[in-house]
Amino acid sequence: MLELAQELEELVHTSLPQAKGMSLLFKADGGHGGTRVGLDESDILPFHATSSGIAMLAFGDPEFRRKTLASARPQFTKETSVSEEALEGMIAEAQLNGFASVHKTYEDEVSSVAMPFFDQTGHAIGTIAVATPSSRMTPEMKSRIIGLLSQASMTLSANIGGLIPQSFRNALIAA
């Protein structure tokens, strides 16, 4: 992950699901010389307002997703989707593409892209994400992040003995 952060010069982090959001497992700052995104180790990233949360809901346990969708969702920015219908649309888009992407939904000037990593049964158990100031999330940068994250997701899953579901592979090929 450190290599990924250095290559992109952006914040890369892995997170695991908890009852109320995604808990930071590891982070690496790519050292961009200008404005940076920061995360505190104690932060809990909300499922509905972060790419990590959306990716987890898209590829995680369906029962967990159902329970999460039934809970209250606070509005963090004017871009935060709080309706169940909007959230289900974001989840479906992530399933179709193999990744979740958000723009100014948790913090006003932050965009991010996340993908799941999988356990030995092929279920998502966490996410790997890149967060960047929104001004740097150009279409070219997003495409580059997606390519590098797909490699990182597969490598991380393989390193923990995970099985990559064919539906995830197909989504990445189609995206």
Task: Describe each PLM feature range.
Residues 1-29, 144, 148-152, 156-175:
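Intrinsically disordered, low-complexity terminal regulatory regions
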Residues 1-71:
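Amphipathic alpha-helical effector-binding/dimerization core
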Residues 54-58, 92, 154, 158:
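Generic alpha-helical structural context detector
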Residues 67-68, 103, 165-166:
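Short, hydrophobic secondary-structure boundary micro-motifs
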Residues 71-73, 145:
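Short intrinsically disordered coil segments
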Residues 76-77:
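Intrinsically disordered, low-complexity polar/acidic regions
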Residues 80-152, 170-172:
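Extended hydrophobic
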